[in-house]
Regions:
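N-terminal glycine-/serine-/threonine-rich phosphate-binding loop
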Residues: 1-23
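Residue-level signal for inorganic ion chemistry
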Residues: 7, 28, 70, 170
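Glycine-rich N-terminal segment of FAD-binding domains in flavoprotein oxidoreductases
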Residues: 17-38
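Glycine-rich beta-strand-to-loop/alpha-helix junction loops that act as flexible
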Residues: 25-30, 107-111, 169
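Ligand-binding beta-strand-loop-alpha-helix segment within the catalytic cores
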Residues: 45-106
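The conserved catalytic core of RNA pseudouridine synthases
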Residues: 92-95, 152-162
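Class I SAM-dependent methyltransferase SAM-binding "motif I" and its flanking Rossmann-like core
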Residues: 107, 111-155
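ATP/nucleoside-binding phosphotransfer catalytic cores, i.e., glycine-rich phosphate-binding loops
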Residues: 156, 160-206
Length: 206
């Protein structure tokens, strides 16, 4: 089954069961093709809540904004009707309730093994990387490339989902993924260590 079809079926099943569904997306170039395919699928999109797993703390129309990426490549065509929630520290606690557990979380991975905005220099942070930590969305100092301050979900909140899809694109990233199973210096190690049954990895060997 294709990744897009798996995401569609999970969202559609949740809508039929509870009347709404939640979809958490990542930025970067890896998911763009999936965004475009998914946005054209017939689904009651007005019943789908969409947010980001992380973002850079820049204006929404900035080229480095993940929100800008989502608006340009996903929230168009049929998916334009979806309910979009910018990522904020109080997203899962404020009154305009965002559905949890999340139905689908779509993640990418960097060449340093980071996912979301959880980077190697943060591994010793209990709140960021421990699966038993309290659910949290928090701001970070400047990280990554581009070197900018960020906002991100922590690992325990990401794991609070019915399905996680990890996209890994390119030979160098695939090598990092293979190493991460036994290398606890790589952030992605902690995601892989805690993966559950509905954890999909799409490897794109380019």
């Amino acid at each position: 089954m294709s990744t897009v079809k798996s995401i569609y079926e999970r969202l559609n099943s949740s809508i039929k069961r509870s009347g709404t569904a939640s979809l958490v997306l990542s930025g970067g170039s890896s998911p763009i093709k999936i965004f475009e395919e998914l946005s054209s699928i017939d689904l009651p999109w007005s019943k789908v809540q969409v947010t980001l797993v992380d973002d850079r703390l820049v204006e929404a129309d900035n080229k480095d904004s993940n929100q800008n990426l989502i608006l340009n490549y996903f929230l168009k065509s049929k998916a334009k009707a979806a309910q979009f929630f910018p990522l904020t520290e109080d997203l899962i606690t404020k009154s305009n309730f965002f559905k949890t557990p999340f139905d689908v979380v779509l993640l990418g991975m960097g060449e340093d093994g980071h996912f979301a905005s959880l980077f190697p220099n943060m591994i010793d942070d209990f709140d960021a990387f421990n699966s038993d930590a309290k659910f949290k969305i928090f701001k970070t100092e400047s990280q990554g490339n581009p070197f900018l301050p960020r906002i991100t979900m922590n690992l325990s909140l990401i794991l609070n989902s019915e399905m996680i899809v990890l996209l890994v694109k390119g030979k160098s990233k695939l090598k990092v993924l293979d190493e991460a199973i036994n290398n606890n210096k790589l952030p992605i190690h902690y995601l892989l260590k805690n993966r559950k049954e509905n954890f999909l990895i799409e490897k794109i060997n380019e």
